[in-house]
Amino acid sequence: KGNSTYQPNQTKNPWHIELDTYKNQDYQGFTDIKLSNVAKDPSFLREVLSYKIARKYMVAPQANYAVVYVNGNQIGLYTSAESINKSFVDRYLYSRKGAFVKCNPPAGAGPGTSSYPDLVFQGNDSTNYYAAYEMKSDAGWAELIHLMDTLANDINAIEQILQVDQALWMHAFNNVLVNLDSYAGGFKQNYYLYRMKNHQFYPVVWDMNESFGKFSMTGTINLSSTTSKAQMTHLLHANDASWPLIRKLLSIPMYRRMYLAHMKTIINE
C-alpha cells in the first residue's frame, strides 16, 4: 500500500492487510484492513475528518485511528480507512456483481503519467483505457465505455447510467475541501465507479490524505499558496474538456444549481 508514502527503508510504512489465509477469517467483520502512515499530514486529521464529512452526503469509507504494533514493537499512530471492495459495495449499495472500476492508473500516477481516469471517450476499443483504469469485476469495460460515450455525445441521457446527484456531491465535496488528489485535480483519480442494479454508476471517493489543500495541482495551475487554495474557483474545470464529468454535468443549468446548493450545504453544515 502507498504510492508516494511507501519507502522501503523507513520503519513506519503504510499497510494493506488481507485476512484471506483462512476461510471466513475476519477482524470485527472486516477482511481487508488498510492503514495509512499519515506521511503527509502532521495534523493527523485530513483523512479521518474528510471521510466523516463525506459520509454525511454520500457513500464513503468509515475511518478511525489505530496504534500499530509489529512483533510487540510500537510502530506509531496510523489512520485506518475501510477498504473499497466487493464487500463494501455489497454493504452500502446492496450488490456485488456489477461492473466495478478503480479509477486510478494501475501503474500509479506521477509526473510522467500520460493516461488518466478522466472519463474522456477514446472510442470503443477497451485497450485504450487499460493504462488509466483498473477493472475490479470480471467484466465491465463495455459499460464503462458506454458511460464515457454518453458523457461525450448524449448528456441528456446521462441519468440512465450515472447517479448524477452523487457525482455532483463528489464534485462539491472535492471543491469545498480543496481535495485535488481526486477527479478535480491534475491526475483526475482516486475514485471508484460501481454499476448498481438499476444500471447507474455510483461514484465513491477515496484516498483523503492530501485533502484540505495539501495537494496543489489543479491540472491547469498550481495553487502554491494558502490564499490561492482558499480562493480557488467554485467552478473549477467547468469549461475544460479534459474533465468531462465536471464540464458536461455543469453545462446543464439544473445540475449546476444542484452542485452549488451542495457546496453551500457542506459549507453551512
Show which residues each predicted segment covers.
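Conserved NTP-binding catalytic cores of kinases and kinase-like/nucleotidyltransferase enzymes
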Residues: K1-F44, L49
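Middle-to-C-terminal accessory/interaction subdomains
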Residues: Y6, Q10-T11, T127-Y129, Y133-E269
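Short, glycine-/Ser/Thr-/acidic-enriched flexible segments
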Residues: Y22, K40, K86, P106, ...
